[in-house]
């Protein structure tokens, strides 16, 4: 039987979502599979909606797995969470259709990047906020970011390690706002390239400080040259909010579009 899980995690202590072999360091995937396998009394493999890098967090990562073990969804949720480290929790578990796929059934994915914008670096929230000491104009960042909307070639914002076959993605929404001392960037797209959100944020920061004009983002997009764009923003400010699925899959409201 196939199940879908909503998983929350603090990525600070992990080398990312994906398990990278025996000597690749701790991963969220390896921890989750070990816990599920313990509950199932049999090996369990999971498939996620979107992989995250080292230090990046997940608010509602969605995974699917198959198991012949007879467990109620609540049993999977509580039993698995009890076997996970404190930095990972299963938020919900529901039965899923046999043809549901956590990655390929998703219609969109959402990320949030938050950075503390003040003179002094963060202490209390240093693992969940990035930091920029120079004053940022969030309104200018928001205006500049709108040039990225639609289906475009995002080569200027992909990492050199990106293994995607092409750089075309449909960016459906991007919003930048200031909330007190925090500048927040929320992005939604059909899919993302490796480091795409962090590279976009790194370039928007240069607009926010006034080092680059608002139309620079559009110029970068058209130029498709990663080497002239801004630096990659640090990972700790990034959260994978989660994917969105069509209602036909009958998943919880927070991941249904």
From Swiss-Prot:
UniProt EC number: 5.4.99.12
Pfam family, one: PseudoU_synth_1
Gene3D superfamilies linked: Pseudouridine synthase I, catalytic domain, C-terminal subdomain (3.30.70.660), Pseudouridine synthase I, catalytic domain, N-terminal subdomain (3.30.70.580)
Active-site residues, Swiss-Prot/TrEMBL: 53
Regions crossing the membrane: none
Keywords: Isomerase, tRNA processing
Coiled-coil region: none
GO molecular function annotations of the record: RNA binding; tRNA pseudouridine(38-40) synthase activity
Alphabetical list of InterPro entries matching this protein: PsdUridine_synth_cat_dom_sf (IPR020103), PsdUridine_synth_TruA (IPR001406), PsdUridine_synth_TruA_a/b_dom (IPR020097), PsdUridine_synth_TruA_C (IPR020095), TruA/RsuA/RluB/E/F_N (IPR020094)
Keyword DNA-binding: no
Residues given in the record as substrate binding sites: 111
GO biological process: tRNA pseudouridine synthesis
Catalytic activity reported: uridine(38/39/40) in tRNA = pseudouridine(38/39/40) in tRNA
PANTHER family assigned to the protein according to its UniProt record, in alphabetical order: PSEUDOURIDYLATE SYNTHASE, TRNA PSEUDOURIDINE SYNTHASE-LIKE 1
Sequence similarity: Belongs to the tRNA pseudouridine synthase TruA family.
Subunit structure: Homodimer.
Function field: Formation of pseudouridine at positions 38, 39 and 40 in the anticodon stem and loop of transfer RNAs.
This protein's name: tRNA pseudouridine synthase A
Taxonomic source organism: Xanthomonas euvesicatoria pv. vesicatoria (strain 85-10) (Xanthomonas campestris pv. vesicatoria)
